[in-house]
């Protein structure tokens, strides 16, 4: 019975590791998407805040959809990060440690599929202003960038596993997870 409990605990820890790796990759992709939105908005001579304000309409209604920074702009940015982070967690749980050839391409296709699922099914009913006013090509490219970033989740998962399995340090000592400082980025 102890062996079965140990396997369940090990499986649960592995799932947590994969979910955290997916969360890291999803949030990295969200920040890439936000950066792309900022560059594309500047190219189109619009404010950086137009896309975050559009996402903020889910909470504050149409009054926050303006071409400038508002108090609700932060909630729009947070919404983008949370949506992409949670989707990245699902990606991490599905792909686990399995890095395959053309993973970036699969991530880009998955990002585009996630865009269509989100904008055609979820947001159409949850917050209809977002799919109505979002710049389509700009958002599609943003979600493709998100997909490419989220495809790195198996790499992050393996790095987390290596950090906590006890790797040998350069001077012959056994390194444990204790050497990882709080807030350290695992690349």
Predicted regions and their residues:
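Aromatic-anchored segments of alpha-helical transmembrane domains
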Residues: 30-34, 110-121
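Short, highly charged, low-complexity non-transmembrane loops/tails of multi-pass membrane proteins
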Residues: 161-187
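Non-cytosolic membrane-interface motifs at loop->transmembrane helix junctions
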Residues: 128-141
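Hydrophobic cores of alpha-helical transmembrane segments in multi-pass inner/ER membrane proteins
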Residues: 86, 142-156
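Hydrophobic alpha-helical transmembrane segments
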Residues: 74-92
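N-terminal signal-anchor transmembrane alpha helix
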Residues: 13-46
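Internal alpha-helical transmembrane segments of multi-pass membrane proteins
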Residues: 95-115
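Membrane-interface interhelical connector segments
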Residues: 43-69
């Amino acid at each position: 019975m102890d062996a079965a409990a140990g396997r369940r605990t090990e499986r649960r820890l592995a799932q947590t590791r994969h979910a955290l790796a997916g969360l890291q990759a999803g949030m990295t992709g969200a920040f890439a998407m936000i950066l792309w939105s900022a560059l594309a908005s500047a190219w189109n001579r619009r404010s950086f805040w137009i896309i975050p304000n559009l996402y903020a309409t889910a909470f504050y209604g149409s009054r926050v959809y303006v071409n400038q920074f508002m108090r609700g702009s932060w909630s729009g940015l947070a919404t983008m990060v949370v949506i992409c982070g949670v989707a990245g967690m699902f990606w991490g749980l599905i792909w686990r440690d399995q890095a395959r050839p053309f993973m970036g391409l699969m991530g880009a296709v998955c990002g585009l599929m996630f865009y269509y699922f989100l904008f055609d099914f979820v947001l159409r009913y949850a917050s209809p202003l977002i799919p109505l006013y979002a710049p389509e090509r700009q958002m599609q490219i943003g979600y493709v960038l998100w997909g490419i970033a989220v495809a790195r989740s198996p790499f992050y998962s393996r790095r987390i596993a290596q950090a906590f399995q006890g790797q040998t340090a350069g001077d012959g000592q056994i390194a444990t997870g204790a050497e990882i400082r709080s807030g350290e980025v695992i690349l």
